[in-house]
Regions:
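Structural/interface elements that position substrates and couple domains in central-metabolism enzymes
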Residues: 1-404
Length: 404
């Protein structure tokens, strides 16, 4: 099948490279000429395991090519994968989607996350929401947990589902509106779980309970599940903040009081402040304090800094007068108020406290005795529960964690 993909960002590039890997002939278009030149040369700026290799494979086989623009011809389907950022009113900005729809004459498949009801205004459009986790995008595309396709024409829906090749994943064929809502409902439910566990962690601190023991007991219940039960500095990234606001705006327009979602958003906005307050309670006044930060991306496995709670925490610390030095394995170049260095040892030098803000697995394997020698005060605040307590304590650190 000849497939066109508009948008060479995180979703679009993964979609294009994976479809080419499955044997389709794929043309990926983007308005950014520099990005198109780089991708045509096999240069992938995104940190996504396996993606660079799939792009190289597609280019070498001739099944994948990149062009500049926002419309494609001579394809059987055009997959729209452009961004839909949040506007000032909390609703998604559909200008990029509408631009592509206005320029495209081929059958269209919407992968971009769009407000519920968007496809209904464009007869013939197929809704095929993406469920890609950053850091696992290639795996999620090639071995999906489910494929959701919404369309007015069941034959067309089945044809789009068939593009994914042989898969054991359940295929959900439904109407456009329901397919659009599946994406929002899924992401917002994950946000609810994350906010719930962060509030539960706060309660554990007041009751002298252990959040790890509590969540271990919870995740063994199949009705609850094991994912999204780790406390942290808050949720962020390109999806959850945007999608929660968009679904809340949709609910308000529909006259539905979505109080649970409002509470989850409010809890998340408060969480970075709670982290900063906890740091201050351990160190005293933050003005003049030297703080080493481990992790800046919104989660491990990606170089994505969009809406990262780590940056929110860092901004609050800087505004209170702290001097910040940070190390993240996927971030280079200083950020406002943050000196970004090339190693954890550099971030630890002279620090009054080390704060883990991203759950990079390599942080568990750091030379903690060496870091203990480099800090001024051996205090470690692990907001992500990534460092084994015995390692930190044997190295001489006093360990503080959310939910303890």
């Amino acid at each position: 099948m000849r497939i066109g993909v508009v948008g060479a960002g995180y979703v679009g590039l993964t979609t294009a490279a994976c479809f080419a890997h499955l044997g389709h002939r794929v043309t990926c278009a983007d308005v950014d000429a520099a990005k198109v030149r780089a991708l045509s040369a096999g240069e992938v700026a995104l940190h996504e395991p396996g993606l660079r290799e799939l792009v190289a494979e597609g280019l070498e086989s001739g099944r994948l090519r990149f062009v500049q623009g926002s419309a494609l011809s001579d394809v059987d389907y055009t997959f729209i994968c452009v961004q839909t950022p949040t506007g000032a009113d909390g609703e998604a900005d559909l200008s990029a989607v509408e631009d592509v729809l206005g320029r495209t004459s081929t059958p269209v498949v919407l992968k971009s996350t769009v407000p519920v009801g968007t496809a209904a205004r464009h007869p013939g459009v197929v809704s095929n929401p993406e469920f890609l986790r950053e850091g696992h995008a290639v795996e999620d595309f090639l071995r999906p947990q489910r494929i959701v396709v919404g369309a007015q024409d069941e034959r067309q829906a089945r044809e789009v589902a068939g593009l994914y090749g042989a898969t054991r994943a359940p295929v959900v064929l439904t109407d456009n509106t329901s397919a659009e809502l599946v994406k929002y409902a899924s992401n917002c439910f994950l946000a609810l779980k994350l906010s719930y566990v962060n509030t539960l962690a706060e309660l554990c601190e007041q009751l002298n309970a252990d959040i790890d023991g509590v969540t271990e007991g919870m995740r063994l219940d199949d009705r609850i599940g094991a994912s999204c039960l780790a406390p942290g500095p808050g949720w962020g990234g390109s999806c959850l903040p945007k999608d929660t606001l968009a679904l809340l705006a949709t609910a308000r327009t529909a006259g539905v009081d979505f109080a649970t979602l409002e509470a989850a958003i409010a809890t998340n906005r408060h969480q970075p402040r709670r982290v900063v307050d906890r740091i201050r309670s351990e160190t005293g006044p933050l003005a003049g304090a030297r703080i080493g930060l481990l992790g800046l991306t919104f989660k491990a496995g990606t170089n994505d800094l969009r809406d990262s709670p780590a940056l929110v925490v860092a901004g609050m610390l800087a505004r209170e007068g702290a001097t910040l030095t940070a190390y993240d394995p996927c971030v280079t170049g200083n950020r406002p108020g943050i000196a970004v260095v090339g190693s954890a040892a550099e971030a630890a030098a002279g620090a009054d406290v080390l704060v883990v803000l991203t759950e990079w697995p390599e942080f568990a394997e750091l030379d903690w005795p060496e870091l203990a020698q480099r800090v001024r005060v051996p205090l470690l605040f692990d907001t992500r529960h990534v460092v084994p307590p015995e390692k930190a304590e044997e190295a001489g650190f006093r360990l503080v964690r959310i939910g303890h």
